[in-house]
């Protein structure tokens, strides 16, 4: 048994070595990433100005106003309402530092990542304490709010300055990370284009004190915790102003809680993901997690916060049915990811069955069917992955559309995330398919023959009979 496992590990390592040294240009190369690095922060300011200062409408030049005057006006508004104040710097970086301390010192579990070819097959250890950090963060936020030390809706009132701090922090940390990697000589899979390499990153596994893995820390905690706190702040703001919380805000609070909670409770399963294993720590990951996700995905929250509940009121019965549908899709999404990750963990002989909330039925498959591949890995073709190859992506799109739909159609900004994310998820699905076809060859083609559906299964009729449901 041990010799078989060792042989499989060696096959995985040999296959990973070829992909680990392969150099590709994505996003249009250096010109494309330059446009992204300049354009996206500007888009964030434009959306903020429209959401807050134009009542959710698109800022456009007034009659007779030149484009030069209009752009100057936008810059003036950004400077006046989104200047990165000392208060905003203090709030943002206190949060980051405390979350970092929680990463290191709160209760958690240990895990090991994939074998890294550039480290001779070494598996890096990971300490996963996001669940403890998550619930302590919620408790601390509520204590600060109700004691009056820091009202949580300050995050809404000071959103402009906080967004600017997040943008500046994302750029600053990206510069430090890139220069640090070059100075220490730990750059990896470089293309020779400083602009492109700055965007994609230079270092693969940056760490602090040997344990705080920056990629995992930024991806799991920072964006989703901030997004939830913004929505919680909106709920508390409404409670103070109206004496109740609108059902639409409660719906969004539920949605953002479930997503952030899922990221925290499944942290030890993320350590073998593509982001942890392959993506380098550059502007793309750093800026996106520090600023892009929390400060642009939140426009559904901002719309609800800045408008009277009567302007986006849904029929309570429709809202209730919608919430039930959302919970069903969450169950599919959570168990789909769980089945995949448990299968990978079982394949490597290391599983940790944590009793974190919520515990859902069918989170893993007993005696799953799989297709062996030339790499030593196997392709799961049971459970949700026996019905469609990207069911979890379908759920992601449903979530995104729900976040926009809850606000109605009076503003385009809450729909930025659903539109952007849908395009991104389609691109990611195509990328995943191409990579899997290249990596697994005929085994992947066999999987496509067995499971011809990509996003939506043709029938759920035989769901209880395909695999044994397991709590």
Curated annotation (Swiss-Prot):
GO BP term (any one): ergosterol biosynthetic process
Pathway(s) where this gene product acts: Steroid metabolism; ergosterol biosynthesis
Effect of disrupting the coding gene: Deletion of both erg4A and erg4B results in fluffy colonies with severely impaired conidiation and increased susceptibility to antifungal azoles itraconazole and voriconazole, but does not affect virulence. The double deletion leads also to the loss of ergosterol production and accumulation of the ergosta-5,7,22,24(28)-tetraenol precursor.
Reactions performed catalytically: ergosterol + NADP(+) = ergosta-5,7,22,24(28)-tetraen-3beta-ol + NADPH + H(+)
Family: Belongs to the ERG4/ERG24 family.
Gene3D superfamilies: 1.20.120.1630
Enzyme class: oxidoreductase
Function: Delta(24(24(1)))-sterol reductase; part of the third module of ergosterol biosynthesis pathway that includes the late steps of the pathway. Catalyzes the last step of ergosterol biosynthesis by converting ergosta-5,7,22,24(28)-tetraen-3beta-ol into ergosterol. The third module or late pathway involves the ergosterol synthesis itself through consecutive reactions that mainly occur in the endoplasmic reticulum (ER) membrane. Firstly, the squalene synthase erg9 catalyzes the condensation of 2 farnesyl pyrophosphate moieties to form squalene, which is the precursor of all steroids.
Name this polypeptide is given: Delta(24(24(1)))-sterol reductase erg4A
Keywords: Endoplasmic reticulum, Glycoprotein, Lipid biosynthesis, Lipid metabolism, Membrane, NADP, Oxidoreductase, Steroid biosynthesis, Steroid metabolism, Sterol biosynthesis, Sterol metabolism, Transmembrane, Transmembrane helix
GO cellular component: endoplasmic reticulum membrane
UniProt KW Nucleus keyword: no
Subcellular localization: Endoplasmic reticulum membrane
Membrane topology: Multi-pass membrane protein
Biotechnology: Inhibition of erg4A and erg4B might be an effective approach for alleviating A.fumigatus infection.
UniProt miscellaneous comment: In Aspergillus, the biosynthesis pathway of the sterol precursors leading to the prevalent sterol ergosterol differs from yeast. The ring system of lanosterol in S.cerevisiae is firstly demethylised in three enzymatic steps leading to the intermediate zymosterol and secondly a methyl group is added to zymosterol by the sterol 24-C-methyltransferase to form fecosterol. In Aspergillus, lanosterol is firstly transmethylated by the sterol 24-C-methyltransferase leading to the intermediate eburicol and secondly demethylated in three steps to form fecosterol.
GO molecular function terms listed in the Swiss-Prot or TrEMBL record: Delta24(24-1) sterol reductase activity
Carbohydrate attachment residues: 15
The species this protein was found in: Aspergillus fumigatus (strain ATCC MYA-4609 / CBS 101355 / FGSC A1100 / Af293)
UniProt-listed InterPro entries: ERG24_DHCR-like, Sterol_reductase_CS
Regions crossing the membrane: 33-53, 89-109, 130-150, 159-179, 216-236, 244-264, 282-302, 313-333, 397-417
Induction entry: Expression is induced in the absence of erg4A.
Source organism superkingdom: Eukaryota
Binding site for NADP(+): 340, 344, 380, 392-393, 432, 436-440, 447
EC number: 1.3.1.71
């Amino acid at each position: 048994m041990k010799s078989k496992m060792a042989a499989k590990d060696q096959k995985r390592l040999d296959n990973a070595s070829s992909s680990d040294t392969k150099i590709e240009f994505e996003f249009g190369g250096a010109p494309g990433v330059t446009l992204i690095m300049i354009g996206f922060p500007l888009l964030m300011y434009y959306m903020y100005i429209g959401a807050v200062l134009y009542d959710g409408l698109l800022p456009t030049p007034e009659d007779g106003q030149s484009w030069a005057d209009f752009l100057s006006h936008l810059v003036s508004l950004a400077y006046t309402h989104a200047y990165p104040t000392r208060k905003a710097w203090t709030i943002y970086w206190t949060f980051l530092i405390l979350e970092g301390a929680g990463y290191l010192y709160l209760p958690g579990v240990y895990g090991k990542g994939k074998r890294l070819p550039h480290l001779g097959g070494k598996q890096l250890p990971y300490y996963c304490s996001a669940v403890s950090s998550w619930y302590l963060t919620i408790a601390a936020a509520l204590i600060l709010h109700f004691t009056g030390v820091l009202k949580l809706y300050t995050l809404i009132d000071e959103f402009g300055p906080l967004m600017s701090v997040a943008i500046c922090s994302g750029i600053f940390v990206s510069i430090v990370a890139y220069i640090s990697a070059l100075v220490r000589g730990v750059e990896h899979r470089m293309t020779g284009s400083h602009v492109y390499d700055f965007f994609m990153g230079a270092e693969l596994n940056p760490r602090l004190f040997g344990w705080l893995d920056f990629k995992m820390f930024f991806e799991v905690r920072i964006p989703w915790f901030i997004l939830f706190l913004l929505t919680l702040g909106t709920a508390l703001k409404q409670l103070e102003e109206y004496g109740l919380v609108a059902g639409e805000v409660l719906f969004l609070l539920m949605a953002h809680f479930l997503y952030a909670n899922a990221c925290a409770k499944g942290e030890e399963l993320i350590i073998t993901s593509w982001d942890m294993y392959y993506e380098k720590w550059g502007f793309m990951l750093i800026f996106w997690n520090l600023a892009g996700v929390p400060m642009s995905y939140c426009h559904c929250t901002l719309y609800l916060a800045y408008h009277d509940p009567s302007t986006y009121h849904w029929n309570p019965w429709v809202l209730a049915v919608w919430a039930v549908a959302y919970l069903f899709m969450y169950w599919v999404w959570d168990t789909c990811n769980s089945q995949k990750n448990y299968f990978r963990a079982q394949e490597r002989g290391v599983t940790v069955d944590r009793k974190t909330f919520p515990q859902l039925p069918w989170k893993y498959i007993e005696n799953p069917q799989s297709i062996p591949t030339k790499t030593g890995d196997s392709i799961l073709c049971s459970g949700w992955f026996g019905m469609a190859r990207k069911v979890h992506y379908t759920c992601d799109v449903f979530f995104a559309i729900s976040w926009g739909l809850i606000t109605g159609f009076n503003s385009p900004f809450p729909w930025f995330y659903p539109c952007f994310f849908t395009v991104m998820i389609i691109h990611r699905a195509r990328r995943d398919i191409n990579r899997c076809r290249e990596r697994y060859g005929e085994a992947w083609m066999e999987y496509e023959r067995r499971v011809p559906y990509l996003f939506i299964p043709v029938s759920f009729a035989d769901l209880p009979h395909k695999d044994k449901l397991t709590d």
